[in-house]
Amino acid sequence: LTASAIIYSHQRQEVWMVGDCQAIIDNKYYDKSKPFEQEIALQRAKLIKNGMSPTEARHAIEPQLVNAMTEGQNRQYAVIDGTPIYMPGTRTIPVSHSVVLASDGYPTLHPTLRDSEAALAQQLANDPQNIATFIATKGLVEGNSSFDDRAYISLTV
């Protein structure tokens, strides 16, 4: 339904964040998470802990996710969805020397890909449904290698 983007502009020496993404810029962590998502993720975790299957729990929260997107996206929170981007919901960060850009597919972002992948592997091994140590709206589905797609790039400028 929506897309996110995190962009580095070499000309402006800035990072632009639209949607749920994360970065480490000059050794400082930044994120742009969806304002409604944590509450819905907590509901999913509670449903699973109370005995509902992960698939059923995901289906149970899907109407809330869709409603939150249609009510809030590009009105309170910036996303890419084919309508004009809600510019007050974007984030611009100046860069002086180093940049790590990543999607929200990494529960914990680290300065290196190796460390970010290791943290993801630990999360998947210890809490594959993302209901305890990293609360999320979805967990690992059989046949997938992770709970979400992911992208990572590290630059020195």
Identify the meaning behind each predicted range.
Residues L1-M17, A23-K28, P35-H97, A151-Y152:
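"…together with the soluble PPM/PP2C metallo-phosphatase catalytic core" -> "…together
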